[in-house]
Structures are given as structure tokens and as C-alpha cells.
């Protein structure tokens, strides 16, 4: 992958740690660009990238297991500072002539270390709390190394070879549980690697615009726009770079939130003066979904039909050379390293036809989600759009459980609009990671006025999370929930009951289908 910035880089090598993305994010938060790459990267490739420093991540393996992950030892002779974290420290010890052995028992959780005031621990207290997670332990350090931190359970909590600027820590500085973890990483990045920290969204835009113009020239780009944050930011960035050479296709499948289709056209078509083709394909999608209740089948139909509609519209355009996509850095990481774990497939509609003769352009594929939001703000996209709720590709199609009908879509659309309005009024938008309503397909007896009803139940799902991999239900104030419930049953036809989902992930997922 081409580096997003022709400037300071901290290279993180992946050994399978669940925290490897966190390392990259922590470095970027310091204003220094960082990328995560497979541990099998060659020395020549590292030389080409010219990083200011290299971090070796942790990992679940033992350095003595058959087939355990390793690196080319020549990396230590490049004159580039190296920091090994947990497995990275054990591997460094082994490759440079020290000794590592299996510990009697796995050390997992908080521990107290005593550190010396050297480059890594500069300005930090001697005694500090760290997060350990390892089953191997260093029993002898290589020649040229000295101990710079110990703990009650290990003499080698941190080590250094100051002359070669090679460091190792047996704990995880990237996690919040490590008291001064960010400070330690900052010391490595700023003091040891001598990075200045000038990576910002503003200079990212300047460099990316220049790259896009250089690559595209006078040719044309096509962008599939969903109205979501990622595709919107991609479209605005491309428009800033190449103007009228960009055409966006917005497929309105009728499964959008209330007013969303019109909002896309107003905010981006008119507000940014972009060329957007809106395809009203509601009837086409509903015909295909008629009688279908299985969630996987619904996803497949919606995804395939999106491709067919997009393909039909793209075929009407001439002289288009590039197809733009809102691929994020997390997608690149998950598909690009040998240590990546297979996870549940994303809801986002993908799989555009392989026979489309376009070059792919992915201008935000080096950014995490929060960085994409920051980029959107820097590009002038209104804050309320940048911070909109995540929305799955199949849209409301997976928030209506069972068969989809226009009446059911209307219930979800209206109830969801009420939920979002109340959350906004109460100032909870940034406190709740994701929130929406679902129609679970349950009808129950109720009383409205003097009449008996037998109507639908609406479920409210609201969760707190950091990255969506795990989540807990949001502790919304009861009075706020009561306000939401009262408005839904009074303002949305055919609803007489509202329930609140108090399940965490795992065991449940955030979406119901």
C-alpha cells in the first residue's frame, strides 16, 4: 500500500496481537504517521519506506513454537530505533542471543514495575502500573543490553541497548490499563526516533489532493455514494481534487432512514455542487425482496441488486477510468496481514462486478474511522453529517425482522427518526456509540384510548463501545427512555409497545439481523 504521507513514519510490524491497531492509533494521536505491516516485510521494503522507528507488536505465540512468527534479524542492523512489545521483546531477545523460556504460569493483568529514568521512561515516576499479557519470560538478556525496569515477577520488565537504540518492554504500553503507556510511546517516538509530530488532516488533504491529481490527470472518476460518512468524505475529497471530473451514483433502494435520500442530494449535490446521479430503485428492490424473510437471503438480494443497478447506470457513462471506494485502513489491515483473524462479514454493500474495467482509487484507505470523521470536518462537511450514526449497507432491510413491507419500513423509519431526535435534544449523541430502532415482528395486545389494539412492538438498541468489536447497552436515563417510548407509541401508527435491548456484545451482535 502506498504511504499516505511522504514524511515521518513509524512502522509497526504485526505478530497477531489483539492490540496491534491500537499501537498504530496511539502513534497517530501524537501527530506522527504510522502504518501496520506484516512481520514478513523485507529489509529492502523497510529501506524503501525509510521509517524513523520500528515497533514490534505483541502476539499470542511462543517464540519457541514451531512456525512462530519472526523477522529478518538484519532489521536490527539498519540503524533504525526498534521497540519490541511483549512478544516483540521476547523475539528481540531470542534473535540477538538472549534466552527466553516458558513461564510457570501466564502473567495476565495489572502489575507494578520499577523503572529507571532513561530515554523510554524519561520524566515518568519510577513506580507505575502496567498491563501484562504473556506466557513466556526472558531469563537472560543479549550482550549490550541492560535492564531499565523490573517487577516482582520478572527481572526484565524493560530492557535497552542504548548504543543501537533497541528497546523491549514486557508489558503493553498501548492499552489504557498501562498508567503511563502513552508517555512511554511518546518518549520512543519523540525522544528516541526524533519525530516532530506534524502529521495532521490538513496536510493529509494537501498531499492526497496532489496524489489524486497526479494519478487521475484529465481522466474521469466514478464514485458509488451511499450517503454514509466514508463514501461522502471520499466524494468531497475527490471533488476538491478534480472537480467536474467526478461523477457520483447514489442508489436509493428505498431502505434509507427518514429524509436521507433528499439530504444526500441537498447537502452534497447542491451544497458542494457535485455531479450526483440519483437512481430511484425502490420498486426494483421491493419486488426482489417480496416474500423473503431469511436475513442472509435479504442481505444477498440487496447486495446483488445494488451491484446490478450500479452496473446499469455506470454503463450509461462514457470515458470513465477510475472507480472510487471508501475503503478504510481497518479493511486493509484485516485483509492484508497473515496474522489477521477472520471475523463476521461487514454489512457494507460491496462486490462490484469484476468485469468492470476501472482502476480502483481508495483515497482514505490509510485512515481509521475517527480520522475519516476528522478529515470530513476539515473538508467542510457539516458536523451533524460527519457524526451521523453508522448505517449498514442493507439499510432498514435488516432492521425489519422477517419479510419487508412498505408499512413495516415506515414504522422503523418514523420510530428511528424520533429516537435520533430525542438523543440529539438530550445531548447524548457523543455518549452513545450507536442507537437505532428495530421491528422484531412481534405483535401484542394494548389499549389506546377506549379501544383494544393488537399492534407492533418497536425495539430500541443503544450501545456504548470503542470500536464495535465489543459493546454494552447504554445506560440511558429512564426519563429519556420514557420520553422516547411515549413519542413512538403516540406518533407512529400501529405501534403499542416499546422495549429496550439490554444485551451486551457478546453474546448478541449490535444489529439484530
UniProtKB/Swiss-Prot annotation:
Q: Which Pfam families match?
A: GATase, GMP_synt_C, tRNA_Me_trans
Q: Kindly state which reaction or reactions the protein catalyses.
A: XMP + L-glutamine + ATP + H2O = GMP + L-glutamate + AMP + diphosphate + 2 H(+)
Task: Describe which pathway this protein belongs to, using the record's wording.
Answer: Purine metabolism; GMP biosynthesis; GMP from XMP (L-Gln route): step 1/1
User: Which EC numbers does the record give?
Assistant: 6.3.5.2
Q: Which InterPro entries match?
A: Class_I_gatase-like (IPR029062), GATASE (IPR017926), GMP_synth_C (IPR001674), GMP_synth_GATase (IPR004739), GMP_synthase (IPR022955), GMPS_ATP_PPase_dom (IPR025777), Rossmann-like_a/b/a_fold (IPR014729)
Q: Which GO terms describe its cellular component?
A: cytosol
Keyword Disulfide bond on this protein? no
* Protein task: Catalyzes the synthesis of GMP from XMP.
Fill in the subunit field for this protein.
Homodimer.
Full protein name: GMP synthase [glutamine-hydrolyzing]
Q: From which organism does this entry originate? A: Staphylococcus haemolyticus (strain JCSC1435)
